[in-house]
UniProtKB/Swiss-Prot annotation:
<keyword id="KW-0662">Pyridine nucleotide biosynthesis</keyword>
<protein>
    <recommendedName>
        <fullName>Nicotinate phosphoribosyltransferase</fullName>
        <ecNumber>6.3.4.21</ecNumber>
    </recommendedName>
</protein>
<dbReference type="GO" id="GO:0006979">
    <property type="term" value="P:response to oxidative stress"/>
</dbReference>
<feature type="binding site">
    <location>
        <position position="397"/>
    </location>
    <ligand>
        <name>5-phospho-alpha-D-ribose 1-diphosphate</name>
    </ligand>
</feature>
<keyword id="KW-0808">Transferase</keyword>
<comment type="similarity">
    <text>Belongs to the NAPRTase family.</text>
</comment>
<dbReference type="Pfam" id="PF04095">
    <property type="entry name" value="NAPRTase"/>
</dbReference>
<dbReference type="InterPro" id="IPR041525">
    <property type="entry name" value="N/Namide_PRibTrfase"/>
</dbReference>
<keyword id="KW-0479">Metal-binding</keyword>
<feature type="binding site">
    <location>
        <position position="183"/>
    </location>
    <ligand>
        <name>nicotinate</name>
    </ligand>
</feature>
<dbReference type="GO" id="GO:0005829">
    <property type="term" value="C:cytosol"/>
</dbReference>
<dbReference type="InterPro" id="IPR041619">
    <property type="entry name" value="NAPRTase_C"/>
</dbReference>
<comment type="pathway">
    <text>Cofactor biosynthesis; NAD(+) biosynthesis; nicotinate D-ribonucleotide from nicotinate: step 1/1.</text>
</comment>
<keyword id="KW-0597">Phosphoprotein</keyword>
<dbReference type="GO" id="GO:0046872">
    <property type="term" value="F:metal ion binding"/>
</dbReference>
<feature type="binding site">
    <location>
        <position position="36"/>
    </location>
    <ligand>
        <name>nicotinate</name>
    </ligand>
</feature>
<dbReference type="InterPro" id="IPR006405">
    <property type="entry name" value="Nic_PRibTrfase_pncB"/>
</dbReference>
Length: 562
């Protein structure tokens, strides 16, 4: 099975993204579902309700990571899934095996006819900041067909939105000047988890990935250095088989190792290092030279294999100056262990000293320092408090596995059937659904930031700027406010109707830009802060409030006491 590039096509007409494989070998296909979706589909068909028009909302109840915002992601994957939805003959044969023997054969004929042509999908733009209870997608169509796609839709939205949000939080913590590199493939939950993580970490705010396949499939910049094993593979200069490097301008060959040795000896005489020559590893120097010969224009060395201060930085500077003599410029160094703040400041101090040795070494004071080593949000904020000198973070485990919260918890709920509203009740008020087909708006105040999201019944007149709007908490009667909107944005667009895309889909880079813009222009700083962020308000109109509570009372059983 081979992955298809985003610009390529399964059948010559329909583009396909990297989550999908050739034809019915796709990872995302009709049988990527829970068994009870198929049993419910059969029950709907058996009772003749399978074609009744239905409306389902996809939403979540609580923002992840103890924060107050979520980044919506996975919309294109959902649309591609619906676009390519079709049971194969082998799918039908398998369903026959798992359903009871007395299931009517006509049901399988019905399954063969199913596709996404009768569905209508409205959604928030991918990459938007979203909040609890507001529908991310609203799916209209035949009841059974809507039911069949539930699990797949949730699978495509839940993790994508979770990891994109996690990436956005890392970006918020690090600031906008730091480069963020996603190094999570080896720690991800399987190959598809790794690909999904790379894609959605990129839109969430990361600059590049180490995942080569993600780079191929999605056009994400690919970055990487070397592992400790590469450094350890050289024990002495005798193992360095190639030492010559062509000068970048003159093309004359020079012995890079010999020049590096001379630079190292010269450096140790120039100022007081925290290292003696006897402590500096010749094997490490050999490894750096080998890598520099292979990549003279992009040399970035891992310097903590033995000792950052007593060996790594000395060898790195020596090789970098040797490269400079041959017309090349090193990119920087990486540290993967130890006290990252202390080491980064020591490295920067060293680089500044080197930059003063000769005018032509001025570039060294800006040499890039990359840090990795199990980095999370808290680590970055602590490093910020310590005024670190790091230019880039390589983040893996805590990013792609979302260790702080492993699931978002999106749900897929029936809100209308045959034009009749549907409501799910619960003793836990937060789990009561908001019934009916709705339209949603984002209300902005005079300071330019969003005040709240407002849900209204579909047939209500649109709210207007500069007019007071009564906004109510869905469940708490006393929480209400009159809002004078400076600007109002409708949140949903129709993306899929009558078997085709209605709204053009943005590129990955356009989604990435939208995430950045959505967070910075929508949310006040107090909504974004790490500790005790201010909750963002999600409200309902007066009519929807009354509608919800009337339906709630109509459906809630009346208890009897004796």
């Amino acid at each position: 099975m081979s992955f298809i590039l985003p610009s390529e096509s399964i059948d010559g007409t329909h583009p396909c993204n990297g989550l999908h494989m050739n034809g019915q070998d796709s990872l995302v296909q009709p049988l990527l579902t829970d068994f009870y979706q198929i049993t419910m589909c059969y029950a709907y068909w058996k009772t003749g309700t399978h074609n009744e028009p239905a409306v389902f909302d996809v939403f979540f109840r609580k923002n992840p990571f103890q924060g107050e915002f979520t980044v919506f992601a996975g919309l294109e994957d959902c649309l591609r899934f619906v676009e390519n939805f079709k049971f194969s003959q082998s799918d039908i044969d398998y369903v026959k095996k798992i359903l009871p023997e007395n299931a009517e054969p006509e049901f399988y004929e019905y399954l063969e006819t199913l596709n996404g042509s009768h569905l209508t999908i409205e959604a928030v733009a991918e990459g938007s900041v979203v909040f609890p209870k507001v529908p991310l997608l609203t799916i209209n169509g035949p009841l059974a067909m809507c039911q069949l796609i539930e699990t797949s839709i949730l699978n495509l939205v839940n993790y994508a939105s979770l990891v994109a949000t996690n990436a956005a939080r890392f970006r918020q913590a690090s600031g906008w000047k730091i480069q963020l590199l996603e190094f999570g493939l080896r720690r991800a939950q399987g190959p598809n988890g790794g690909l999904t993580a790379s894609k959605y970490c990129y839109i969430g705010g990361f600059d590049a990935t180490s995942n080569v396949l993600a780079g191929k499939l999605y056009g994400i910049p690919v970055k990487g250095t070397q592992a400790h094993s590469f450094i350890c593979s050289f024990s002495s200069p005798a193992e360095l088989k190639v030492r010559l490097l062509n000068h970048k301008i003159t093309n004359e060959k020079a012995d890079l190792f010999q020049i590096s040795m001379e630079k190292r000896a010269w450096l140790l005489d120039q100022f007081s290092w925290k290292a003696a020559l006897s402590e500096v590893s010749d094997g490490e120097l050999s490894a750096f030279v080998a890598y520099a010969i292979a990549f003279p224009d992009t040399f970035l060395a891992l310097i903590d294999t033995y000792d950052v201060i007593r060996s790594g930085v000395v060898n790195f500077v020596a090789v970098s100056l040797a490269l400079h003599d041959l017309g090349y410029r090193s990119m920087g160094c990486r540290i993967d262990s130890g006290d990252l703040s202390y080491l980064s400041k020591e490295l920067r101090e060293c680089f500044v000293k080197v930059s003063t040795l000769k005018g032509e070494y001025k570039f060294f004071e800006k040499m890039s320092i990359v840090a990795s080593n199990d980095i999370n949000e808290e680590t970055i904020m602590s490093l910020n408090d310590q005024q670190h000198e790091i230019n880039a973070f390589g983040v893996g485990t805590h990013l792609v596995t979302c260790q702080k919260q492993p699931a978002l918890g999106c749900v897929y709920k029936l809100v209308a059937q045959s034009a009749q509203p549907k409501i799910k009740l619960s003793q836990d008020v937060t789990k009561i659904t908001i019934p009916g087909k709705k339209k949603c708006y984002r209300i902005f105040g005079k300071n330019g930031y969003a005040i709240l999201d407002l849900m209204m019944l579909e047939d209500e007149p649109e709210p207007q700027p500069n007019q007071q709007i009564l906004c109510r908490h869905p469940f708490e009667e006393s929480k209400r406010a009159l809002v004078n909107a400076n600007k109002i944005i409708k949140l949903h667009n129709v993306y899929w109707k009558d078997g085709e895309m209605i709204t053009p889909l943005p590129t990955l880079n356009e989604i990435k830009e939208h995430v950045n813009e959505s967070i910075r222009s929508t949310l006040r700083q107090d909504h974004r802060r790490y500790l005790n962020p201010t909750p963002y308000k999600v409200s309902v109109s007066e009519r929807l409030y009354q509608f919800l509570h009337t339906l709630w009372l109509q459906n809630a059983p009346i208890g009897q006491l004796e």
